[in-house]
């Protein structure tokens, strides 16, 4: 049973959008983030959960993605306007931790040709996995543009050592209804990952990149 109602979320979304689109409009597209605080959870003892949810609308349309591809997918990436690296490019990194860390920071997510996915850990070590950015596989039969949109629309809740998480659930150009729906979907999915569901939720806050925080719970 959800502890927050759509009317409650709508009230805050109205204020958030008014602030970002009227009171203080920025010259870039602000992301709307859901920030979560946990309680009665011990990341050392309790299971560290991880879950992904594909939202109906893409929260960050300008999210940066890089494709590790064979010749076919490197070509396709160019036509989709997405950065790509070949196996040779990855080999040139020479397992250098600094360079791999820089690559991991430069992009929000990665996609890899199915034929290459098994080589990624060998070429790049465990760093992408540690950052929660292990590539999503794509086959030659998949629509690459569709896959890029899927990756941009998928949010990930992953508990590490600290009891707070933040995920992008939308942006300030979205319609009010769309944003309310994305927030409710994200909250309900997140709560379903928790051991004791709502008993583990300490706080739920939504905020735009530069705007004030609105507490939902």
UniProtKB/Swiss-Prot annotation:
Entry annotated with the keyword Phosphoprotein: yes
SUPFAM superfamilies for the chain: Ribosomal protein L1
InterPro entries per the UniProt record, alphabetical: eL8/uL1-like, Ribosomal_uL1, Ribosomal_uL1-like, Ribosomal_uL1/biogenesis, Ribosomal_uL1_3-a/b-sand, Ribosomal_uL1_CS
UniProt PTM comment: N-terminally acetylated by acetyltransferase NatA.
Modified residues (Phosphoserine): 79, 86
GO cellular component terms, A-Z: cytosol; cytosolic large ribosomal subunit
GO biological process, one term: ribosomal large subunit export from nucleus
Modification type N6-methyllysine: residues: 47
TM region(s), chain numbering: none
Subcellular location: Cytoplasm
Residue list for modification N-acetylserine: 2
Single annotated GO MF: structural constituent of ribosome
UniProt keyword terms in alphabetical order: Acetylation, Cytoplasm, Methylation, Phosphoprotein, Ribonucleoprotein, Ribosomal protein
Keyword Calcium: no
Predominant location category: cytoplasm
Note: Present with 116000 molecules/cell in log phase SD medium.
Subunit-level organization: Component of the large ribosomal subunit (LSU). Mature yeast ribosomes consist of a small (40S) and a large (60S) subunit. The 40S small subunit contains 1 molecule of ribosomal RNA (18S rRNA) and 33 different proteins (encoded by 57 genes). The large 60S subunit contains 3 rRNA molecules (25S, 5.8S and 5S rRNA) and 46 different proteins (encoded by 81 genes). uL1 forms part of the L1 stalk.
Function per UniProt: Component of the ribosome, a large ribonucleoprotein complex responsible for the synthesis of proteins in the cell. The small ribosomal subunit (SSU) binds messenger RNAs (mRNAs) and translates the encoded message by selecting cognate aminoacyl-transfer RNA (tRNA) molecules. The large subunit (LSU) contains the ribosomal catalytic site termed the peptidyl transferase center (PTC), which catalyzes the formation of peptide bonds, thereby polymerizing the amino acids delivered by tRNAs into a polypeptide chain.
Family assignment from sequence similarity: Belongs to the universal ribosomal protein uL1 family.
Name of the featured protein: Large ribosomal subunit protein uL1A
Organism for this UniProt entry: Saccharomyces cerevisiae (strain ATCC 204508 / S288c) (Baker's yeast)
